[in-house]
Structures are given as structure tokens and as C-alpha cells.
């Protein structure tokens, strides 16, 4: 009988511990972190492969040659973008972890009646700092989203020409890389619908794959923007709660001091009356 009671108390203790642990998880920050990681993974992975596909298309179909020496050409820029992608992936992996840790600490401070004054003050400063950083990163991701839409637009034009090539058999339409700033203005790198290179481009899998990879990368950048907005809402709410916690803690301190003073006054008067009576 006693063993059964002990087992029941142990199970109850484990259940309460699990509930307490689950209650301390910052679910809003967790959702935003998952969305951020998904968006960054899609953008970085698909963007990297799309850039590699772009190099293949430029070399095989547009006959663009990599410049010799330290010349800054489109291939050099693509290599730079790839290194930027590596940095973005690493930076936002760390930033997501930091925001999750901040969410855990802030949620813990709020759960404990607003925690102790030093913790809530620190949490308030950290939340304010992260709000500023997240707002800057949101603007940066908006710029990345706008920039990623440019290759999507370019590939959409080529893909549309390939889809309608049978309708425009007698029309010779050309796609000039100079209008997108990919090659210098003095170099003429064009592909026309009546050209053999255009037929090879449309029949290859590189165009279709690269186009859709850029679309997925654009969707990933959009998901990262949504994650940043979500983080801003979470951080703003946490900052407001922690600010309220500081005020509540100050009120409790003032109230306890007043009660202590009243208690001391009553004690002093009681002693005076007792002394006067004796």
C-alpha cells in the first residue's frame, strides 16, 4: 500500500515537473525560430545551387567567358554572393539560438512573478537590444527579397520565351544580357529564339531547375521576413511584460517597506504603553 502511494507521488511529481517545463517554453519564439531556420535554409541552399546553375547557363548557352586575373566580372560577383550565403547561414543560425535563449530567460522571469528586479532589468535591456537588431535584420531581409526577385524576373522572361517558342516560330526575339548589367555594354551577348543556342537552352534542364530554385530562394527570403516580423512582435511583448514586471516589483518593495514601517510603529507604541502601564 505504501509502495503504491510512493509510486503515485513519484508519478505526480514527474507529471508536475513536465508541465512546469512545458510551461516555461517560449512557444512564440520557438515558432519564429523554426520559420527563420526554414527560410534561411531555403534561401541559402536553393540560392547557392541557383547561382551554380546560372554559371553553367552563362558559360554553355550565352558563351560568357570568365575574366582573367583580378577582373571583376559576373562570375566573380557570383562567387562573392556564394560566400555571403555561407555567412548568412552561419550568422542567422547563431542569431536564432540567441533569440531562443532570450525567450527562455524572459519567459522564466515573467513566470516567477515577474522574477527578481535585477533579472527583469537585464531582460528589459536585452529585449530592447534585440528589438533594434531584429528590426535592422528585417529591413535587410526585405532588401534581400527585392534583390532575389531580379533573377526570378530574368529567368521568367527566358522561360516564357521557351514556353511560347512554337507560337513565335517566324519571330526572332533576342535576350540581351547587357540590359541586366550582367556583361559590359561593349560586349554583345545575346540569345535569339531562332538561334541554336536558344533551342539548347530551352531543352536543357538547367533553365527549368535554376528558375525554380530562384523561386524557392525568393520564398525562403519571404519566410525570413515573416520570421523577423514575428520576432519583433514577440520581443515587443516580452519587453512590455518585463517593463511591467519592474514596476510591479518596485510596487511590492514599496508596499513591504510601508508594512514594515507600520509594524515597527505599532510595536513601538505597544512598548510605550506597556512601559507607561508598569
From Swiss-Prot:
Keywords: Membrane, Transmembrane, Transmembrane helix. Pfam families: Myelin_PLP. Its main location: membrane. It is found in: Membrane. One of its GO terms (cellular component) is filopodium. It comes from the Eukaryota. The chain crosses the membrane at residues 30-46, 84-100, 130-146, 213-229. GO terms for biological process: neuron projection development. It is a multi-pass membrane protein. InterPro entries: Myelin_PLP, Myelin_PLP_CS. The keyword Transmembrane helix applies. Belongs to the myelin proteolipid protein family. This is Proteolipid protein DM beta. It comes from Squalus acanthias. The lineage of its organism: Eukaryota, Metazoa, Chordata, Craniata, Vertebrata.
Amino acid at each position: 500500500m505504501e509502495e503504491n502511494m510512493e509510486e503515485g507521488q513519484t508519478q505526480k511529481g514527474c507529471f508536475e515537473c513536465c508541465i512546469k517545463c512545458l510551461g516555461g517554453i517560449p512557444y512564440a519564439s520557438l515558432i519564429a525560430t523554426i520559420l527563420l531556420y526554414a527560410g534561411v535554409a531555403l534561401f541559402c541552399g536553393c540560392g547557392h545551387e541557383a547561382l551554380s546553375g546560372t554559371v553553367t547557363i552563362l558559360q554553355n548557352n550565352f558563351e560568357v567567358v570568365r575574366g582573367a586575373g583580378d577582373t571583376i566580372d559576373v562570375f566573380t560577383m557570383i562567387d562573392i554572393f556564394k560566400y555571403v550565403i555561407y555567412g548568412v547561414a552561419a550568422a542567422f543560425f547563431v542569431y536564432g539560438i540567441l533569440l531562443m535563449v532570450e525567450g527562455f530567460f524572459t519567459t522564466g522571469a515573467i513566470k516567477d512573478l515577474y522574477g527578481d528586479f535585477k533579472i527583469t532589468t537585464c531582460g528589459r535591456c536585452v529585449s530592447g537590444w534585440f528589438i533594434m537588431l531584429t528590426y535592422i535584420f528585417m529591413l535587410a531581409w526585405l532588401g534581400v527579397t527585392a534583390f532575389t526577385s531580379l533573377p526570378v524576373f530574368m529567368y521568367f522572361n527566358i522561360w516564357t520565351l521557351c514556353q511560347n517558342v512554337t507560337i513565335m516560330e517566324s519571330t526572332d526575339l533576342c535576350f540581351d544580357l547587357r540590359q541586366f548589367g550582367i556583361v559590359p555594354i561593349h560586349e554583345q551577348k545575346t540569345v535569339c529564339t531562332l538561334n541554336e543556342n536558344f533551342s539548347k537552352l530551352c531543352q536543357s534542364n538547367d533553365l527549368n531547375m535554376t528558375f525554380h530554385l530562384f523561386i524557392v530562394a525568393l520564398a525562403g527570403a519571404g519566410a525570413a521576413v515573416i520570421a523577423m516580423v514575428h520576432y519583433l512582435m514577440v520581443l515587443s511583448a516580452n519587453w512590455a511584460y518585463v517593463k511591467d514586471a519592474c514596476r510591479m516589483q518596485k510596487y511590492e518593495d514599496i508596499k513591504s517597506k510601508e508594512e514594515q514601517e507600520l509594524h515597527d510603529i505599532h510595536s513601538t507604541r505597544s512598548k510605550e504603553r506597556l512601559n507607561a502601564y508598569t
